[in-house]
Amino acid sequence: MGTEFNGLFDEWAHTYDSFVQGEDIQYKEVFAHYEDILEDVVNKSFGNVLEFGVGTGNLTNKLLLAGRTVYGIEPSREMRMIAKEKLPKEFSITEGDFLSFEVPTSIDTIVSTYAFHHLTDDEKNVAIAKYSQLLNKGGKIVFADTIFADQDAYDKTVEAAKQRGFHQLANDLQTEYYTRIPVMQTIFENNGFHVTFTRLNHFVWVMEATKQ
């Protein structure tokens, strides 16, 4: 993942919070139970947390309130500006992405929500391999994102979006890199993790991977 999505992120920054509140009918199901999803990620995290894709700071705020020490990474300048308005003044957000970032001294948990699909499956593998080197035994990766149980589930979801006239959603599903559970399970296991997948709405699953 380079900077190819930065323009999209900057454009989306000022409307993102309305999306997650379900104001766009096409994405309402994608963000169903949004607060519960964030809380689940927080509850599965511990210690020093590295967060990729801070966005407008919604997950970050919950992590801080839960007493986590958070290192935030966000590629979009506009997103960083909005997040800084919502978060404590002393909290800093570093420019970077899943593959290119400043490594904090000690990390226990790596988290992200609604962002890992910006990487191809090959890039996902590179990223997880990198994180495996950063985490000690017992360290965790907790990612919430749109993924699919298998190809059939993906195909049916795309077709349903088209049938409902949700053409923007269908295009999104077909142009970004939404992966399948077997792919992610293989990636995690090949890099020394035990992983579980928990579905929290039709689109979003929480991946909880523990370093062995």
Swiss-Prot record:
Residues engaged in binding S-adenosyl-L-methionine: G53, E74, D97
GO terms (BP aspect): methylation
Coiled coil (UniProt feature): none
Keyword set, alphabetical order: Methyltransferase, S-adenosyl-L-methionine, Transferase
EC number: 2.1.1.-
UniProt key word Methyltransferase: yes
Keyword Phosphoprotein part of the UniProt annotation: no
Top-level lineage group: Bacteria
Class of the enzyme per the UniProt entry, highest EC level: transferase
Record-annotated membrane-spanning stretches: none
Molecular function (Gene Ontology), one example: S-adenosylmethionine-dependent methyltransferase activity
Xref: InterPro entries: Methyltransf_25, SAM-dependent_MTases_sf, Uncharacterised_MeTfrase_YrrT
UniProt-listed Pfam families: Methyltransf_25
Family stated for the protein in its record: Belongs to the methyltransferase superfamily. YrrT family.
Function: Could be a S-adenosyl-L-methionine-dependent methyltransferase.
Protein name: Uncharacterized methyltransferase BT9727_4108
